[in-house]
Amino acid sequence: MPKETKISSKNSNLHDAKKNKNDEFYTQLADIEKELRHYTEHFRDKIVFCNCDDPITSNFFKYFIINFKELKIKKLISACYIKEDYNLFNCEDKKISKGYFFEYNGKENEISQPSSEDIIYFKGDGDFRSKESIDLLKQSDIVVTNPPFSLFREYIAQLIEYKKKFLIIGNINAITYKEVFTLIKENKIWLGINMGRGISGFIVPECYDL
């Protein structure tokens, strides 16, 4: 994690992030718990894929590790994107140049809190649109994450294309996108229980200019 973090929940900040493509906002654990507690039965015997989440620091990954046995998950996969030798979770660390992922099966003595020595590196950057990430997507049953804000429409389109079940937490303004609203109208996707209410905000690295 960055040495310091700040909370951002202002729409102006999110619009700036979309424009500048600095849109990796990290969802707080409390907000994840608040929403996902309504869907616990859907994770039983499922392979869960968090395809926009650093397995070392992601709160989505942490939530599923904490609740792995209770939810009776079959397998958890968490993968993240690394751009231009830049680790999004540590603004001073430029040693990592490839995306990476981690798989957890809930076996006895299996590592559940991976370090940089435990992760598996992609050949590429780990973008959710890459073949490597899509290969992981194909083997998964349900996707849970907070996708990149500037790529929200493309992200949703991919999940629909591969006929994946998903639960994503993001900016409520996304429902105004034509592509997203059409899916809601056709009853192919639904709004969450909280629908943007009661969300504490997002954690962003201190070095981001918001």
Residue ranges and their predicted role:
Residues 1-210:
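Class I S-adenosyl-L-methionine-dependent methyltransferase catalytic core
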